[in-house]
């Protein structure tokens, strides 16, 4: 990698024919000089909409409608962050919520589910990967490929 925070995992809109930089550049037109360059491709590169942090391994995501979970009163994305292994201080190992407004990310992420990593980073109790809205439409189901379980996250009954 290029460092602990670079390049960040990201959330972005996708449109047919668009180019997001790989392998020539990242986060817009930031050139990666470790690879042979193609200036025409770098010029076409779009900047992603929202940074999720470096090496968080943000793998699974789903749309969460406003009010589905207590305290989350706007629409947004729930994102399973599988967690890093290749940085000096580990990151990820949780499920975050990114609020949306007008169809775009609009605010800092909030933790939905955390505690999968020991404070001293010596033990991973779980690594969230897949995230879906439960069949009851009032909960999230989170696949954990370390604990080999599916967590159900819902408000108090």
Regions found by a protein language model. Name each.
Residues 1-113, 118-126, 133, 155-156:
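Beta-propeller domain segments
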Residues 132-157:
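Blade-level signature of beta-propeller repeat domains, shared across WD40, Kelch, NHL, RCC1
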């Amino acid at each position: 990698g290029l460092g602990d925070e670079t390049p960040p995992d990201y959330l972005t809109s996708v449109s047919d024919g668009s180019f997001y930089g790989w392998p020539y550049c990242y986060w817009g037109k930031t050139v990666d000089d470790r690879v042979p360059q193609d200036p025409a491709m770098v010029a076409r590169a779009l900047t992603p909409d929202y940074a999720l942090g470096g090496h968080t391994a943000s793998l699974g995501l789903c749309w969460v409608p406003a009010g589905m979970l207590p305290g989350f009163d706007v629409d947004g994305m729930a994102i399973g962050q599988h967690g890093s292994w290749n940085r000096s201080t580990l990151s990820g190992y949780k499920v975050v919520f990114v609020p949306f407004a007008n169809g775009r990310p609009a605010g800092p992420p909030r933790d939905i589910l955390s505690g999968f990593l020991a404070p001293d980073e010596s033990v991973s109790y779980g690594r969230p990967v897949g995230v879906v809205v439960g069949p009851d439409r009032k909960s999230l189901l989170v696949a954990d490929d370390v604990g080999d379980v599916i967590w159900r996250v819902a408000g108090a009954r």
